[in-house]
Amino acid sequence: AVWRWLYEHPEASAAELRSAVTRIAQEVWNKHYAPIFGKKDVIAEIEGWYSCTSDTPDFWRRDGEPYPMHGGRFTGDPAYFKHVRKAAKKLMERLDLRVSDVNYFVAHQPNVQFPMRIAKELGFKEEQYLPSLQVAKFGNTYSGSSPVGLAAVLDIAKPEERILIVSYGSGAGSDAYSLVATSQILEKRKRQKLTLKYQAENPFLEYVDYTTYRRLKNGM
């Protein structure tokens, strides 16, 4: 959606682009990626979780500034990789899991490089992490990026398959969850027509419409 907006608005300013990306992320998440947690009739059960945080200001907004800024390379090793790595490893240790015990690995995906690098570093193979890698299709949806990856995996996961998902938030921290698909996932999947694959490949599905464009032109 972001690339399409850029194609349709080649003369857009940097400020308009930032606003458009924020609006796209909000609309994608609000319309299609609101997960529901419950105690019964679930398609996947939470096996365990682990959280870690630190005072690592890799992304911030100065007082009076309308948009945040990030710390360049500082957002990599001391921020994203350190926290995602720790959360994933600690949860696997807590649950006594090996890499081979995980069917799908889902990481926060601000770009293509970061989740691929951490997946390989942790020892996961392509068939374990590529199904969740959706950032090239949807762009950076920020806090929605790991749920988008999870949605892609849930569209293909089989009963008893394990999913390791690790989110990341600037500031900084990560939450890791181990999910195990239940037998209900196959039946409930039949009711789902708006799959992630459909949304990514449907040329008629627009997230940025005329109303959004008018809001951009009018300064939101």
Residue ranges and their predicted role:
Residues 1, 15, 23-26, 31-37, ...:
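Active-site-proximal alpha-helical scaffold in enzymes
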Residues 10-14:
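Charged, low-complexity interaction regions
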Residues 23-26, 31-82, 86, 165-171, ...:
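Condensing-enzyme catalytic core mediating Claisen C-C bond formation in acyl metabolism
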Residues 87-101:
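Phosphate/pyrophosphate-binding loops at sites that engage ATP/ADP/AMP, CoA/4′-phosphopantetheine
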Residues 100-108:
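Short glycine-rich phosphate-binding loop at a beta-alpha junction
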Residues 109-125, 177-178:
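Short glycine/threonine-rich loop-to-helix capping motif typified by GTGT followed
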Residues 118-149, 159:
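A beta-strand-loop signature enriched in Asp, Gly, Thr, and Trp
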